[in-house]
From Swiss-Prot:
Function per UniProt: Catalyzes the attachment of alanine to tRNA(Ala) in a two-step reaction: alanine is first activated by ATP to form Ala-AMP and then transferred to the acceptor end of tRNA(Ala). Also edits incorrectly charged Ser-tRNA(Ala) and Gly-tRNA(Ala) via its editing domain.
Protease found in the keyword field: no
Catalyzed reactions: tRNA(Ala) + L-alanine + ATP = L-alanyl-tRNA(Ala) + AMP + diphosphate
Compartment(s) of residence: Cytoplasm
Species whose genome carries this gene: Pediococcus pentosaceus (strain ATCC 25745 / CCUG 21536 / LMG 10740 / 183-1w)
Protein name: Alanine--tRNA ligase
UniProt cofactor(s): Zn(2+)
Sequence positions that bind Zn(2+): 567, 571, 669, 673
Length: 881
């Protein structure tokens, strides 16, 4: 078998199925779109759910893809096994109600064994089938496969709950006896068992049943094919690699780490684990950040942060102590450039995000080492020789400390780590994560009600907002097809419509339906795309309507024009942000309504007011320049050559629409727009904020809404001017600065007076001194305005010989505040301020702590301050009694 590169294997797979009438679907973003059940795209079929459950009908029923995916349920195994990865690619071919078992099996055999394609030795191939699936077995026997290489396996049935399910057939490659890690009589020593010899390279799922909510199965209205071939696995076969890590997908990264560390891969088992972890995690982090995810403390951002910190810690185990992971980005980009050119294009941004996170982790790591040293000291103080599993997990979860590193540090101090306890805590976290996630469903139960609506419905809303003599073709009311619309809510299809269906962030049109007499018979309240692409109207029927009758459809013109202005303004905003912030900004979501527009975009860092002013200025200049807005319908490749921006997560058909605003902006867009930018009138940013890790949001208004916003702002400014006794609006900033200066001066005077009062009280607290068993104690209730003054009094006490122990209490606002201090000589005798404060804080319904010589507490019951001071005296008696 001829050696092939990963790029050749990927391209050959896609080309093969393209030759069989499949459309190549580009790899979707790792960040799921419109699917809250998924944290990441975790398989090839995850992006096909809408097709398989019937909610959308694809333009062509045959699809193929190489889909990048992330799975994080077993991160700890990465580096320890031959094939565990966080990021992987899944090659797949899919049939949506088209071909089935016959073609899927024969094509699989052809691709694998034909000299024109993969050219694998047929004697090396084994397949498994579901015992009851005699049809699949019969078809396999039609191929030249050795009949003894067909194995029946009971669990060859793909089923993850409600939705499409069915038997599957797995294909294995026999790597030979040299890879066999089991004894001959081991029950797992067979194709399909847990072993290293027979490597699963492809799984073909025959989706032929609907798993219904009641647990029963029924035949699918439309049978599907869903297959998955792990690219990394197949590459290891073609490159005769012992594990996936010795292939061209990982080795360049490993070689780069060799240069940085001075260590060689393959010489030490423990070091090899670190090399593998870094290579795997670098790929996942690079692609995830490139797709818009950013390190954070929750969700997918937390996954990235955890992977990054794990890779950094493994770098330290290899002796790489400086920031280095960001240097892997161009290496990953070079490996994947044939199919993912965007990685190299975005490498500067991706590397910047990674380096920033590495720098932040270096600071965190210092805190982690401090915590570890504290844990070690506390463990020794307790007389124990074992760091608890809870503490070890706390280090791992908060600071990214691998268990191995914690064990190494502990060993240097003569301690060990409770590994079983650590694993228990790890399991608890996994359970918490599982319960926190939405229940994952691969697909909904397939319904043919909407899928079977094949009536053609032409959208003409780009050219007109009114259509006469539109024929009512289909009616869905009360969950069933009918010919008559009764008063109430219904969904209807017309043969032609001017109503825009919600898409691309633009809300649906609203309007009216009139009968032949001009009487309003229904209101259109929403429009959505049906599975076959028609505009499906949700209406509120006022009178009966009949299928086959002609009606006049009219869009609410005022509503529609406001939406158009905001949509074109959104395109201007998108380009202006790229001009000011950089090309790394990508649209992450939008909402275009008549009242305002909302635009989410990726950006790492804050957006300054100066930047927002520049963006706003550019957009208004383009409005005043009266630039024509044009639309061109063409094919995708021609559109790209025109310079049109494609949204990364959007899928485009054979025909696309390019919306151009002169030479300034070109985007693929199916929405409606003004004819000239001057129709927008005015653009004003209302707010800018962060809505997630690495995602910013701008809200803005245009036209009349922008003018109303500015009028409101001006009225507020006039009110402020009145309060400041300012005759001119332009004087408001100066007057405000004067007011702030006066407030600051008065605040300083108040602070000085309070300090004098505090000093006066500090001089008098000596009168409260009592001696208890040879220890002088001052326990006093004082009057201060803040905790800072209370601490200052305690600091002043340190330099005086008024007592050996001090307890001060004060009511500040509606809270009780306590502070305790112990002179160093008495700390050595065993009196600790932290113990004292913990003993008295409950009296005021509070708690606290601190160092042996200084501690503080707060409580919600200031009425019990006297009781707390008395408790201090009693505590001292108990300590010295």
């Amino acid at each position: 078998m001829e050696r092939k590169s990963s790029s050749e294997i990927r391209r050959m797979y896609l080309d093969f199925f393209k030759s069989k009438g499949h459309i190549i679907e580009p790899s979707a973003s790792l960040v799921p779109q419109d699917d809250p059940t998924l944290l990441w795209i975790n398989s090839g079929v995850a992006t096909m759910k809408k097709y398989f459950d019937g909610s959308v009908v694809p333009e062509v029923p045959r699809l193929t893809s190489s889909q990048k995916s992330i799975r994080t349920n077993d991160i700890e195994n990465v580096g320890h096994t031959a094939r565990h990865h966080t990021l992987f690619e899944m090659l797949g071919n899919f049939s949506v109600g088209d071909y089935f078992k016959e073609e899927a099996i024969h094509w699989a055999w052809e691709l694998l064994t034909s000299k024109e394609w993969y050219g694998m030795d047929p004697e090396k191939l084994y397949v498994t089938v579901y015992p009851k699936d005699e049809e699949a077995k019969k078809i396999w026997l039609e191929t030249p496969i050795d009949p003894s290489h067909i194995v029946k396996v009971e669990d060859n049935f793909w089923d993850i709950g409600e939705g499409p399910s069915g038997p599957d057939s797995e294909i294995f490659y026999d790597r030979g006896e040299a890879f066999n890690n089991l004894e001959d009589d081991d029950p797992e020593n067979y194709p399909g068992g847990e072993n290293e010899r027979w490597l699963e390279i492809w799984n073909i799922v025959f989706s032929q049943f609907n798993h219904k909510p009641d647990g029963t199965y029924e035949p699918l209205p439309h049978k599907n094919i869903d297959t998955g071939m792990g690219l990394e696995r197949v590459v290891s076969v073609f490159q005769d690699a012992p594990t996936n890590f010795e292939t061209d997908l990982f080795l360049p990264i490993i070689h780069e780490v060799e240069k940085l560390s001075g260590k060689k891969y393959g010489e030490n088992k423990e070091s090899d684990i670190s090399f593998k972890v870094i290579a795997d995690h670098a790929r996942a982090i690079t692609f995830a950040i490139g797709d818009g995810a950013i390190p954070s403390n929750e969700g997918r951002g937390y996954v990235i942060r955890r992977l990054l910190r794990r890779a950094v810690m493994h770098g330290k185990q290899l002796g790489v102590n400086e920031t280095f992971l960001y240097k892997m980005v161009p290496v990953v980009g070079e490996i994947m450039k044939d199919y993912y050119p965007e990685v190299l294009a975005d490498q500067d941004y991706i590397a910047k995000v990674i380096k920033s996170e590495e720098d932040r982790f270096s600071e965190t790591l210092t805190d982690g080492l401090e915590l570890l040293n504290t844990i070690i000291d506390e463990t020794k103080t307790k007389g124990s020789d074992t760091i608890s599993g809870f503490d070890a997990f706390r280090l791992f979860d908060t600071y990214g400390f691998p268990l191995e590193l914690a064990k190494e540090y502990a060993s240097d101090k003569g301690l060990k780590v409770d590994e079983a306890g650590f694993e228990d805590e790890m399991q608890k976290q996994k359970e918490r994560a599982r319960s926190a996630r939405s229940t994952e469903k691969s697909m909904g139960v397939q319904s043919d009600l909407l899928t079977d609506l094949k009536t053609e419905s032409k959208y003409v809303g780009y050219d007109t907002l009114r259509v006469d003599n539109a024929i009512l073709e289909n009616v869905i009311q009360d969950g069933k097809l009918t010919d008559i619309v009764e008063p109430g809510e219904a969904r209807v299809l017309f043969n032609i419509t001017p109503f825009y269906a919600e898409m691309g962030g633009q809300v649906a049109d609203q309007g009216e339906i009139r009968d032949a007499n001009g009487e309003i018979v229904a209101e259109v309240i929403d429009v959505q795309h049906a599975p076959n692409g028609q505009n499906l109207h949700t209406i509120k029927a006022l009178k009966k309507m009949h299928s086959g009758a002609a009606y006049t459809l009219e869009v609410n013109r005022a509503f529609h024009l406001k939406v158009e202005k905001n949509h074109t303004a959104t395109h201007l905003l998108d380009q202006a942000l790229r001009d000011i912030l950089g090309d790394h900004t990508q649209q992450a979501g939008s909402l275009v309504e008549p009242g305002y527009l909302r635009f989410d975009f990726t950006h790492f860092g804050q957006v300054t007011n100066e930047d927002l002013d520049r963006v706003e200025k550019i957009i208004n200049e383009k409005i005043y320049d009266e630039i024509p807005v044009t639309t061109v319908e063409t094919d995708l490749e021609t559109g790209k050559k025109m310079g049109a921006i494609a949204l990364f997560n959007d899928k485009y058909g054979k025909k696309v629409r390019v919306v151009g605003i002169g030479d300034y902006s070109k985007e693929f867009c199916g929405g409606t727009h003004v004819k000239n930018t001057n129709e927008i009138g005015l653009f004003k940013i209302v707010s800018e904020s962060g809505v997630g890790a690495g995602v910013r949001r701008i809200e803005a208004v245009t036209s009349q809404a922008a003018l109303e916003f500015l009028n409101t702002e001006e009225n507020l400014l006039k009110q402020t001017a009145g309060l400041l006794k300012s005759a001119q609006l332009k004087d408001v900033p100066t007057k405000t600065e004067q007011l702030q200066s006066n407030v600051k001066a008065l605040t300083q005077k108040i602070s000085q007076l309070e300090a004098k009062i505090a000093k006066s009280q500090a001089a008098n607290i000596g009168d409260e001194m009592v001696e208890i068993n040879g220890v002088r104690l001052i326990a006093a209730d004082v009057q201060v305005s803040g905790m800072d003054q209370l601490r200052q009094m305690a600091d002043d006490w340190k330099n005086k010989d008024q007592s050996d122990v001090l307890v001060l209490a004060a009511k500040i606002g509606e809270k009780a505040n306590l502070i305790a201090a112990v002179k160093d000589d008495f700390v050595k005798k065993g009196l600790k301020a932290g113990d004292l404060i913990k003993a008295i804080a409950p009296k005021v319904n509070g708690g606290g702590g601190g160092r042996p010589n200084m501690a503080q507490a707060g409580g919600s019951n200031p009425d019990n301050i006297k009781a707390a001071l008395q408790a201090a005296r009693e505590w001292l008696e108990s300590q010295n009694g």
